[in-house]
Amino acid sequence: MLRRHFLSSALAAAAASLFARGAFAAGQAMDGMQGMEGMEGMDDMPDMKPAPAHARHGKPAPGPASALAAADALPAGAPLAALRVLANESREPGVFRATLVAQPVARALLPGAAPTTLWQFGADTQGPAVGPLIDVREGDAVEIRFVNRLPQPSTIHWHGLPVPPDQDGNPSDLVAPGATRVYRFTLPKGSAGTYWYHPHPHMATAEQVFRGLAGPIVVRAADDPLAGWPERHLFVSDLKLARDGAIAPNDMMDWMNGRQGQFALVNGARRPRISLTGDERWRVWNGCSARYLRIAFDDGRPFAHVGTDGGLFDAPREVASLLLAPGERAELVVRAGDRASHAVLTALEYDRGKMAMAMAMSEAAHGSLPPDPALPLADVAFEPAAPRALPARLRAVPALGEPVARKEVVFGEQMDMAAMMRAGAHGRPAGMRFMVNGATFEPHRATLTSRRGEIESWTIRNETDMDHPFHLHGTQFQVVEREIDGETTPEPYRAWRDTVNVRKGERVRILTTQTERGERMFHCHILEHEDLGMMGTLKVV
């Protein structure tokens, strides 16, 4: 039974009539709901000072009626830019040493508008605003110096990498503004895959990511069967801009459903052009705060799915579409074909059950917002080329074995409308709680405890009315089966993942193990939900 906890239901009728009628229309028109800066922060959240909503050279903040820029206001159609690559400062074999500086950078984005101040890794004002690609190999000793030039504390979380707990950028390990921290870890054999990095300070993760702080990681293996293939990187993010070029603050609907900017970007650009002159290996990242990407070509042409978060799996799978929840990654093989053609890489319509305001205000109000419509990501021109031989077997993914312990994670939510209607500080919504096992996140409180090296079976149960992507730090896991509406479906293939979507009313069972003692986080990867408490701590002993 799906359960959403409602408090102060006496407000429902009046509140629903006030808000529900215009909520979806306003979202579709992208007028936003900008004037929510006065909402009370949650009592159990640390005091993170948000950046000013305008964040632009002392310009006035957008007023409550400030509208968003039109969905076609950003230029489109430029050739897809290659990602910047983080330079290795070391000359020692097997050592990768580099520096990442997080800082505000003004960039000219919207024609006719003032420069937009992004937060990014590096000072570049041209080229992709995405953080630089960290390109490393299994066995490398990695040492990255992080310099925080932001107005907030921050961290770097190495999403999916098997790094020690004290090197993983957990929210309890903050780097103060103006401070420096060095992260050190070694990449073990078998860790080749497609990863990414982003901040993880509690109650500021969403803001720091939507302002631009995220970047890709590729870990390579010496025995990669696709090493000789041309490789293309597509880092998908989104951006929510006001008409004057300012990054718009979160409104109540952003906090409730997760923020989706009106601009979907690939390597920092809107709808770029890709020219395919032969078969290619693509690595695709969903670096959005909340947007789901059901990627496909608009003409239905198939492609091969060859890898997940943690790298290649056993054999290629031919598919016509592939769902990537926020935080997920995929490796694909895209064929040029035997004749010239064109297709649009598209994020197809997907219904993740986003709440309408009326749902939040009344237990009797059922339904949700319409599905996100299809969205073009890139235009792809295919030039004919001889096909490359794709190996029938890619990489063995051995079964983890029988579990010796079992865990359960339950996603839930609670809306207190009396609190949500009160004015407060910092734009944080009071009374909106996203929970794990009935509680919101508290630093250092162990939600679950595991023993190092033990194989465990985890069941992730979604008792809310919308999808939530589950992410577990410090390891990769294997999805075993999914159960919804009383029907259990075994996972059709074995793969390494660190993020998996859990649909409303669904139970997903995974097998996992942790190799080092310490604190690991697990949470929903809709970043607003994570910030509002849908996160737990795993204590590994």
Locations of regions flagged by a protein language model:
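N-terminal export signals
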Residues: 5-26
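Active-site pocket scaffolds in enzymes
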Residues: 26, 113-115, 160, 166-171, ...
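Histidine-centered copper-binding motifs that mark active-site loops
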Residues: 26-27, 32-326, 332-333, 353, ...
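Short, charged beta-turn/beta-strand-edge "cap" motif at the junction between a beta-strand
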Residues: 148-151, 287-289, 336-338, 463-465, ...
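Short, surface-exposed ligand- or partner-binding patches at beta-edge/loop junctions that are enriched
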Residues: 195-198, 338-351, 515-526
